[in-house]
Amino acid sequence: MPGDGGERCGSIGGMSTTGAREPGWVQDVIWWHVYPLGFVGAEREAGPDQAVVHRLGHVAGWLDHAVELGASGLALGPVFASGTHGYDTTDHLRVDPRLGDDADLDALIAACRERGLRVLLDGVFNHVGRGHPAFRAVLEHGPATPTASWFRLRWPDGADAWRPGTEPEYDDFEGHSALVALHHDEPAVADHVVEVMTSWLDRGVDGWRLDAAYAVPTSFWAGVADRVRARHPDAYLMGEVIHGDYAGFVAGAHVDAVTQYELWKAVWSSLNDGNFFELDAALTRHGGFLDSFVPYTFLGNHDVTRIASRLTDERHLAHALVVLLTTGGTPAIYAGDEHAFRGVKEDRAGGDDAVRPPFPATPRELSPLGLPTYSLHRELIGLRRRHRWLHTARTRTLHLANEQLVYEAVGDGGRLVVALSVGDRPAEVPAAGVRVVLAGNAEVADDRVRLPAHGWAVLEG
């Protein structure tokens, strides 16, 4: 893929660390995250003899949009054969026929390479769909089949009493019987995961998002990660972790990063409640994570309500984006958020559809109502790319009140000051050492910044 891979990092922000291991190229990545099955308008379920429909070219048609936005990487949701939503994988080595075939994915990877975009794939290795050949063999041939050890099975009346048609009980993923949990103590499972990951890295992708990584023992990930990096030392491995000991997981699993859900929640919750104390606490914890790894940061993804719908005041969408792009992390923009797409996730069958919509053939067909948000994304992404050190920047609070927050982002000799207000009246806040407004709307005088109602600004000396 484009550019020098560089060495794996051993320091963050000029400070020595013991856990930082990400590839050097990650410093410059801003992901544009796409959920392919929704993006291309694929059928909700794959048929038993699903014909190949060449739809991945639809994603390729939007790559110039990603580049113009300022993104430098494409983070793809599930692209492998599955029964429904992509997270019930039936073949990790074959593209979902609803999206196309392997040649289509190869072409998409090549199109990314031509534009200087890195590629991240979504790997579901905690569980498989019931239609996966390894589990299907168990149903057809019983406990003696070689892949029976891939799963935690409980046979009625015992394995010796098995008869054709007898189905075992099995561990699943969080109560979803369609998602059969893998047995991660089984060496053959690790061998399979390593084969899948290295096969696609061999074909030109740059890394993996590890779905439901929190549900898998860190010892399993550590063994897999070490074997994958033996062949692909510059591969980026990022695990989905919702809460808990982020730094401990990264160290134990030998991954580069995890999803930063704590910061995601604090951003929209603080803005909605007019309570910047919550965000301040989250930024303090975030700084602690940066001592050992660089989190994967985001405002939206395929699993959560769109940020434009989550916020109770649309004026605060800018504030949320400012925080994302002026704090340490590897940021991702969920496709559509840059045009203020709305969508509410619901806890029901099909409840994700609103946040995984089909996209038109080209960006020109989008509503012009989203253009101001698109322009803001371009402005702030451009600011971040001009200040590369923000990737590992630490924040320090300069002023804190319920409705106002001023913090400085510092790193590698650089310094920016961010001022935010969600109050209904203009606010004057301290901000020593700044003279220039880089983005936003503010007046600067005598080490103080005057913000309009619901205003924000990014400043420097």
What are these regions (language model features)?
Residues 16-184, 188-195, 202, 209, ...:
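Acidic/aromatic-lined carbohydrate-recognition and catalytic surfaces
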Residues 22-27, 42, 46-47, 51, ...:
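Loop/helix patches that line or flank the sugar-binding groove of alpha-linked glycan CAZymes
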Residues 71, 205, 255, 329-330:
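A structural motif
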Residues 416, 425-441:
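Beta-strand-rich binding/interaction modules
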Residues 446-461:
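C-terminal beta-strand-rich structural cap/linker in extracellular carbohydrate-active enzymes
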